[in-house]
From Swiss-Prot:
Top-tier EC class: ligase
One cellular-component annotation, GO: cytosol
Source organism (scientific name): Buchnera aphidicola subsp. Cinara cedri (strain Cc)
Protein name in the entry: Leucine--tRNA ligase
Motif ('KMSKS' region): 607-611
Motif stretch ('HIGH' region): 43-53
Reaction catalysed by this enzyme: tRNA(Leu) + L-leucine + ATP = L-leucyl-tRNA(Leu) + AMP + diphosphate
Length: 847
């Protein structure tokens, strides 16, 4: 490294080799140190990284390096979520086995991750399609099966025609497949389920433990679990021996029922309506479309059964309908319809001319009318009186229902974890003995244009258990199973005695910091929490939740374009194949495909992904500007929780900044020990040392407390520019310059580790190593006299101003304010729901 010019390519290669050689980031249990487990969501090996990956993994690496500098024992592992349908689809297209394609991609992506300088413990790398990983998943499946937490039954499931497989409810988004966008149909087939619903109450209760999770994720999980308290009411079917059971959360509206409605899968249909030709035609046409039409565009349809249900209170005959908006898999699959209280009921009754009455007063919408003995009662009193009446008459019971359903975990695919189950000649289900694990996939046989399931592998299907001829289960596990427990296996992936090493899990878990997109809030993060609770119940982990703190980073978005294929499907085009026309303000007005010169469609700025063909290869950026410039740009361009608009031109500014630092360090190194001129005043020294302490304080706070990395970088750049300007005006002592620039290098190190590694050695010699340095501490004495005027607000209204020391924390500030007599009066017997604090400026108590 003799050349004094900034050459990122040369520097980064050298530094990365050093890290590997010295095993800098390998971790082990060290009880003398405080641990910090930082985990980015593991990638699917799709072929190449794009900037969305780079953002996720850079955030994780910056946090990991920062906490190492705080003296903690940091674990930051990486692995590969390597089962999945894309591998099978590629296998068909390219006549290659899914395994070969997957491992080829892993090799490519691993090289890319290493080129970005991420401080992973590669000794703990996991590949989920490796039998050495999934054997433990198979063993846990058997344990769950024996505890009756896993079961198989014939059930109505979501079916994707394109992918030829079942989907869990969480994987159906607005009636279409979450992966390929195909419209979902329903099928009744035998499937494996895991009892996630049994844990619904624990899910909700333990959300309060997730104090450092985004509120949006907490809210999404609450809604997905969907706890509803209400009444389960028995209603007699007119001239039949049977009852219709309905569930309602609004018993006060019962006097306004104008019709009852059941789902297209309700058991009453088979009991009474099998021979009704009109109904059978209706069901044949609509039964397998679930309520996707309603979900997507609020299209309502139904049919009158010409059966009647007796109203449980006034004994009137109420018509019974079958409708697409009644969910077959929620509560009883039957509802009481009150058009004056429910918009969907109202629209349905208007569509089919079903008469209804109003039960709420025009003058006071909270008072009941047309409700017999319950007239003039308000909603609360009516609810209590009607509920008590129905319960006392033994017509109803208090009931709780959950929206969340048991997790369907079986898939009709080849490339997945084989389910460790066999079936004997008497149709008995038998678990594969532990000594026979792992059950390994058969060697892949290429079949043109055909997605495969294990049922095609006849030789593999037939086996023997304890000398008995048996047939293997042909379904594989949902790939979300692998990604639901990998974090625990990371703690010691080479452990051979059990699913998880108890010593390693006790030391490292729970995860201190988890990083991934908000799109995982109700799929991966639900399963992730669920699996941890299972592991907790089996004694494998000690904490009730898997993760203390969650960051949901925003997407990296970019201008994206497509055209339509002959079959009507979209073909997404790479930006390199497009000519773009912009107006004077830079707005895109049209785009043309270079090869055909035909107009194409601009889709706007959307998430970078392989499926949209809009990814920017980080390798090209690294070649041109270096990994440090890319890392710094990714962390500076936008706050981490919002979308980052990609623009390759903006990275140039970060590259120039690093070049300036590089050159300035060499200027300082060459500087002689000069006599101090009169112009170098003591008060000037105090100014820049004070400013440096201010910057250390701000940068530390922005990284540690706020995860505001962009503002932390802005503060570092601001101080560096100030230092350069000062250097040009004043003759500052060399030791003071070195102190200042060394502090800047330390603070930049988590963001740009390669350049900082080299500059540290240039300043302090070959034997020095920045990895052994600690995070700079600010000197409190510079702030003890400094006070800020803090505006105190309650519900956004100013109540007082207090002078408070700049150095103290938010918690200490709140303690001081709550002792203020003026504020005490306003907060007396009030509950503070939320506290909003803008450092050194405003604090707002929301009541």
């Amino acid at each position: 490294m003799k050349n004094n010019n900034y050459n990122p390519k040369k520097i980064e290669k050298y530094v990365q080799k050093y890290w590997v050689k010295k095993k800098i980031f390998f971790t082990k249990i060290d009880k003398e140190k405080k641990k910090f487990y930082c985990l980015p969501m593991l990638p699917y090996p799709s072929g190449k990284l794009h900037m969305g990956h780079v953002r996720n993994y850079t955030i994780s690496d910056v946090i990991s390096r920062f906490h190492r500098m705080l003296g903690k024992n940091v674990l930051q592992p990486i692995g590969w979520d390597s089962f999945g349908l894309p591998a099978e689809e590629t296998a068909i297209k390219n006549n290659i086995s899914p395994k070969k394609w997957t491992f080829k991609n892993i090799k490519t992506m691993k090289k890319q991750l290493q080129s970005l300088g991420f401080s992973y413990d590669w000794n703990k790398e996991i590949t989920t399609c490796n039998p050495e990983y999934y054997r433990w998943e198979q063993l846990f499946f058997i344990k769950l099966f024996k505890k009756k937490l896993i079961y198989k039954k014939k059930s109505i499931v979501n079916w994707c025609e394109k992918d030829k497989t079942v989907l869990a409810n969480e994987q159906v988004q607005k009636g279409v497949c979450w992966r390929c966008g195909t419209k979902i149909k329903l099928r009744k087939i035998s499937q494996w389920f895991i009892k996630i619903k049994k844990y619904a109450d624990k899910f909700l209760k333990d959300l309060k433990l997730l104090k450092k999770w985004p509120k949006e994720v907490i809210s999404m999980q609450k809604n997905w679990i969907g706890k509803s308290k209400g009444l389960k009411i028995k209603c007699k079917i007119y001239k039949k021996k049977y009852f219709l059971k309905i569930f309602t959360t609004k018993p006060e509206t019962i006097m306004g029922i104008s019709f009852f409605a059941i789902s297209m899968y309700h058991p009453l249909i088979n009991l009474f309506l099998r021979k009704n030709i009109e109904i059978q035609k209706f069901l044949k046409k609509n039964k397998y479309s679930i309520n996707t039409e309603f979900q997507k565009s609020n299209i309502l349809f139904g049919i009158n059964t010409h059966l009647y249900v007796i109203h449980p209170i006034n004994k009137k005959k109420i018509p019974l309908w079958i409708s697409n908006y009644v969910k077959y898999n929620y509560a009883t699959g039957a509802i009481m319809s009150v058009p004056c209280s429910n918009k969907i009921d109202y629209n349905f009754s208007k569509l089919y001319n079903i008469p209804f009455i109003k039960i709420f007063s025009k003058k006071n919408k909270k008072l009941l009318i047309n409700s017999d003995n319950f007239n003039n009662l308000n909603i609360k009193k009516a609810r209590n009186k009607i509920s008590n009446f129905l319960i006392n008459k033994k017509i109803a019971k208090k009931y709780i229902y959950y929206k969340i359903q048991d997790w369907c975990i079986s898939r009709q695919r080849y490339w997945g974890t084989p389910i460790p189950i066999v079936i004997d000649n008497k149709k008995n289900i038998i678990t594969v003995p532990k000594k026979k694990l792992p059950v390994i996939l058969p060697k892949y046989i290429y079949k043109k244009k055909s997605l495969q399931s294990l049922s095609l592998y006849s030789l593999w299907l037939k086996t023997k258990i304890s000398g008995k001829k048996v047939t293997r289960e042909t379904d594989t596990l949902d790939t979300f199973m692998e990604s639901s427990w990998y974090y625990a296996r990371y703690t010691n992936p080479k452990y051979e005695k059990d699913i998880i090493d108890p010593k390693a899990s006790e030391y490292w878990l729970p995860v201190d910091q988890y990083i991934g997109g908000i799109e995982h809030a109700v799929m991966h993060l639900i399963y992730f929490r669920f699996y941890h609770k299972l592991l907790y119940d089996f004694g494998y982990v000690q904490s009730k939740e898997p993760v203390k703190k969650l960051i949901c980073q925003g997407m990296v978005i970019i201008d994206s374009f497509y055209k339509y294929n002959k079959d009507g499907s979209k073909k997404w085009l790479s930006i390199s194949k497009i000519e773009i026309n912009r107006d004077s303000k830079g707005k895109i007005i049209s785009a043309i495909e270079k090869s055909s010169q035909k107009k194409i469609i601009y889709a706007g700025k959307i998430k970078m992904s392989k499926s949209k063909n809009n990814g920017i290869d980080p390798v090209n950026i690294i070649k041109q500007y270096g990994a440090d410039s890319l890392r710094l740009f990714i962390m500076f361009a936008a706050p981490i929780n919002i979308s980052l608009e990609w623009n390759s031109k903006n990275i140039i500014g970060m590259h120039r900044f690093l070049k300036k630092i590089w050159n300035f360090v060499f200027i300082i190194i060459k500087k002689k020990k000069e006599k101090i001129k009169k112009i170098d005043l003591n008060k000037n020294k105090k100014t820049y040392i004070y400013k440096l302490n201010t910057i250390i304080k701000k940068v530390t706070y922005n990284i540690q407390e706020r995860n505001s990395f962009n503002t932390a970088i802005a503060e570092i750049i601001k101080f560096f520019n100030y230092l350069v300007k000062l250097y040009k005006i004043y003759n500052i002592k060399k030791k003071n310059l070195i102190f200042c620039i060394s502090t800047i290098i330390k603070m930049l190190y988590p963001f740009t580790p390669h350049i900082c590694f080299i500059l540290w050695k240039k300043i302090y010699g070959k034997k020095s190593c920045i990895e052994k340095e600690t995070w700079p501490k600010f000197n409190k004495k510079f702030f003890l006299k400094e006070k800020n005027n803090i505006i105190i607000q309650i519900n956004g209204k100013k109540k007082d101003i207090m002078k408070i020391h700049a150095i103290i924390s938010k918690k200490e500030i709140i303690k001081l304010i709550l002792k203020n007599e003026k504020i005490k009066k306003h907060l007396y017997k009030k509950i503070i729901k939320k506290t909003i604090y803008i450092p050194n400026k405003v604090i707002n108590f929301v009541l």
